Amino acid sequence: MAAPTLTDPALARRLLVHEARGQLSLGRELRDLGDGWLLYDPADSEPFWNRLVAPRWPAAPEPFDRRLDEVITLFSTLDRVAHIRPLPLGNEPVNMVDRLLAAGFDRIGADRRMVLVDPAPCREVVAAWNARTAGRLAFERHQDGIAEVGPGWATDAATVLAAAFAVDPLRRVALETDVLACTARRGCSILMLRDDGDAVAVARRATISDGTYLSSIGTRPDRRGRGLGSLVTALAVADALDAGSAFVHLAVELDNEPARLFYEGLGFGVVGGIVPDLLLR
């Protein structure tokens, strides 16, 4: 049975904007447009890094269309494809998604937003692991440009993520660069589990202001079913809470029902409906 869905529009907006803040890096900007937030990367045209988040526009047709034209023009001046990510609930206007689809946008993906509502399951997982006096599992935390082990750790983390998410091997170097970029940013850390020295599970934690966004949570396919994903997630949550985070959140792809159930089991709840990624065709 699915856990109750949270229906707080202010929380939904807070999470989407916080996610964008957690994805800032050197040169990447988050602009407050007054009626939405624009994430813009001058060096990378990938739509994921160039998107308008949580827009709030007039409901009347003419002002809505005028604002949409302005936003499309803004993306064009930045030499980017218009990419809009509405809220999972509380959109203004309420039929924002339908209007954008009618205006020529395509849904290229969708996910659900989840926020920690009960820390007890994660605390219990961590406590059970801490109670072990010996074992092959080791936990590493890489943050603030400081690695707890040798320089090869980033390669190991990228290899785990590439396997976990079936990423093209040619992109492994890009993954490694992204991993290193995370640890160079204040508040961003990579958590990794090793089993007898082999990297087996990874999670990324971005703690910004009073919240934490978790992402890139993955386990090597040949090591799944052993509780490693639960453990690395629980350790990331524990770190976030210890850092004083008032909220901890993550995103799950819409068609990944097992992942939703997995995170619900760790104390997370779904916020609103789906969050579509809309790209102008």
Predicted segments with their positions:
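Short amphipathic alpha-helix that is part of the acyltransferase structural core
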Residues: 1-18, 53, 111, 125-175
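N-terminal charged segments
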Residues: 1-78, 91-93
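A short, internal acetyl-CoA/4′-phosphopantetheine-binding micro-motif in the GNAT/acyltransferase core
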Residues: 53-61, 217-224, 253
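Acyl-donor-binding surface of acyltransferase catalytic domains
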Residues: 64-154, 277-278
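Conserved acetyl-CoA-binding loop-helix of GNAT-fold acetyltransferases
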Residues: 64-72, 216-221, 225-242, 261, ...
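Conserved GNAT acetyl-CoA-binding A-motif
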Residues: 78-88, 240-251
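Conserved active-site alpha-helix within GNAT-family acetyltransferase domains
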Residues: 91-107, 226, 230, 254-273, ...
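A conserved beta-strand-loop-helix scaffold within acyl/acetyltransferase catalytic domains
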Residues: 170-220
